[in-house]
A protein has these predicted regions:
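Residue microenvironments linked to proteolytic maturation
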Residues: 91-171
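Polar/acidic, low-complexity leader/linker segments enriched in S/T/G and N/D
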Residues: 1-63
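Short amphipathic beta-strand and strand-loop transition segments with alternating hydrophobic
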Residues: 8-12, 83-100
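Acidic low-complexity intrinsically disordered segments
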Residues: 53, 59-64, 85-87, 125, ...
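Low-complexity, polar-biased intrinsically disordered regions enriched in Pro/Ser/Thr/Gly
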Residues: 34-49, 78-85, 96-99, 137-141
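Glycine-centered flexibility motif
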Residues: 30-32, 67, 88-91, 151
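Short acidic, glycine-rich loop/turn motifs
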Residues: 13-14, 72-76, 137
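Short conserved beta-strand and strand-loop elements enriched in small hydrophobics
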Residues: 47-49, 58, 66-83, 127
Length: 171
């Protein structure tokens, strides 16, 4: 039995099946900026939307991201489901958890698609979660609540910047 990983970089491994395996910071607590039209507010205005630890790290949120598909960019349909996953999914995420710093939601990422692996190896490594959430006005702040995961998109520029990316986070 051959048990040897092939390193593509210090942060990415190709397993014996040719799948890219890594860990990623998926999401973070704190404020992120949204245009008003993205969140049902005044168009053209920028709003800070807060994610509190109790909302990001609760059991329901963590479980909702377990085994969700990985995509290249967010789908135009906005969601991945049983009707479109075959065209959109290039891998999956699992072992979703809070990182040691208490700031990030992290997970293990497996990418199966050779085309997607090449895109990652060429440097596209930021990620953005696709999800549903309620926006709640609380103490003069807009915050996300009831976060329910749908997919993880590999993007050029994610909303939480280069803090959320593939190959970042302890395995």
């Amino acid at each position: 039995m051959k048990i040897q990983d092939k390193q593509t970089s210090p942060k990415f491994t190709l397993d014996d099946n040719g799948y890219l395996v890594t860990t990623a910071k998926l999401a973070r607590i704190g404020a992120m900026q949204y245009l008003g039209e993205e969140i049902g507010k005044e168009s053209g205005k920028i709003y800070d939307v807060h994610v509190d630890p109790d909302d990001l790290f609760n059991d329901a949120t963590i479980k909702s991201f377990e085994n969700m598909p990985v995509t290249i960019e967010h789908p135009t349909e906005m969601y991945v489901d049983a009707n479109n996953w075959q065209e959109l999914a290039v891998g999956h995420i699992s072992n979703i958890r809070k990182d040691e710093s208490g700031e990030f939601l992290i997970g293990d990422v497996v990418v199966n698609s050779p085309k997607a692996i090449k895109i990652i190896q060429d440097g596209k490594i930021e990620v953005s979660c696709g999800y549903d959430a309620d926006l709640v006005d609380a103490d003069g702040k807009i915050k996300k609540a009831n976060i329910k995961g749908n997919h993880l998109a590999i993007v050029n520029e994610g909303r939480c910047g280069d803090k959320c990316k593939l190959g970042d986070g302890k395995p």
